[in-house]
Every structure is written in C-alpha cells, then in structure tokens.
Amino acid sequence: VQLLQLYLFVTNPKRYNIVEKKNYSYDEAYGESLKYFQGDELAARVWVNKYAVKDSFGNIYEKSPEDMHWRIANEVARIEAKYPNPLSSEELFGLLDHFKYIVPQGSPMTGIGNNYQVASLSNCFVIGVDGEADSYGAIFKIDEEQVQLMKRRGGVGHDLSHIRPKGSPVKNSALTSTGLVPFMERYSNSTREVAQDGRRGALMLSVSIKHPDSEAFIDAKMTEGKVTGANVSVKLTDDFMQAAIEGKPYTQQYPIDATEPAFQKDIDASALWKKIVHNAWKSAEPGVLFRSEEH
C-alpha cells in the first residue's frame, strides 16, 4: 500500500495527498477530534469510537476527521483517475472537509480506503434468494448471507413472506411446517451472535399482511425476550387498509402472489389493524410498510 501511494505521489503529486501512516493513542485522537469539533465532546468520542480507522488490535490510525476525509478523497481520486475529467483528491477533500457538502454514510466513512479491515461500503442490504425460497436450504442460505454481511458491518433486511404458514404439509418427518415465527428467532439469534465493534448487528424482518402467519408475526415480540435481535415491520396493502376501514373481511393466502394459492383464509381486517396499533403502542413494534410507497 505504501509503495502504491509513493508511486501515485511521484507520478502525479498534485492529485494525491499522502497522509502519514502512524498510530495514535485514544487520548491523542480524542484531543485532536475535540479541537476539530470545536469542543463537542459527544461528536469527538463518537468519531473516535466508530469511524476512526483501527486495526484488529485496536490501534488507531487517524487522529481526526481531517485524516478520514483525506483517506476517502485519496481513494475516490484513485478511481476517478480511470475516467475522463477526474476530480483530484484536493477537490474531493474540499467537498468532504468539515462535512460541508458531502456526508457519507457510516460504513463508507469507515470502509473507503481502509486497508486494516474488511468493511462494507454500504450501510444496509436487502437480501433474499432467486426462485423457490421455501426450503431449509434457502432459509439457511439467507441466514449465512446475513451473517457474512453483518460481520462486515452491514445492516440487513429481508422478507419472510416466502415461508409457508404454520400447519402446511412438508415432506419430512415433521409432516407439517412450524410457520415463520421460529425462523424469526433464528435470524434474530444470528444477529445477536455477530459482534460489530462491541455492538450487535442491525436486522429488520418483514412479512406481507397477506401471509396467513402475519398475525403470529405481529404478536411475536409481545413475549418478553423473544426476537430481541431484530426489528419487525408488516407490509400493508391498500386493499387491506380499505377492508379495515369498511369493516370487511380480508383474504390471506399462500403463496401470497399466487393466482391459485395452496391455502386461503378470511380474517377480520379491522381487528388485525387494531392489533397492529395496540402492539406498536405497547412494545413499539411492529412497524408498518406501505408497499405502494416503497423505493
């Protein structure tokens, strides 16, 4: 890395700013950051604890956000140089300096140009599998992908509407499906097991209101100690909300998008909506997602 930096500097010294690589004590980094943030102790501590580049032994290699912004600017300039009319590291630094014009997300601030850790360059990921997803193989594949992303600092979200409802026939010794709630617990436990610099990962689970197990999903976190490693949200549709307003029944089915579903049942939409509101008041979950507003 140092040889590459030297080569880039010698061949084009105006385009790259080489930050000296040395490590700092926590007090040194905190002191410099405190000056940078003009006495804001919280900002200084958060930056040193979460965003200053460190190796796996805890050695700190940046003393203030100025070093971080040069690291990001140099790395982006390296990529820019491959394209016409590239921006120099000085120009990029001017956009980043003191968080004036560009404020990267947390993971990019930590990961871009970081040669000490394998870190994600995105804060959040939505994952799933292509094709048939209702099998143990598919469920565990999602679990593995979730863990791999989380250990690289990524937050993860995935939908459980592909899992067959409780009581559905299965071709194994269990004879019937356990439904989606036990898998909520599995994904939650995986989240709790993955450390991210002393904190657990971030997981969001969702399910369609059209899924026959959506009420069990909505109730899952009402029991203390259950699904503590995940936030949960239910995906609502306009036809469900209209049924709830008019006091009409609403049809749930599995698969949720099938024209000829294997299973259907009618529910009281108004009662389920009231349960969503009550549970959110009681435990702050579930959240609600309106599919027509997703982007």
Question: Where is each model-derived feature located?
Answer:
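Extended catalytic cores of very large enzyme megasubunits
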Residues: 3-294
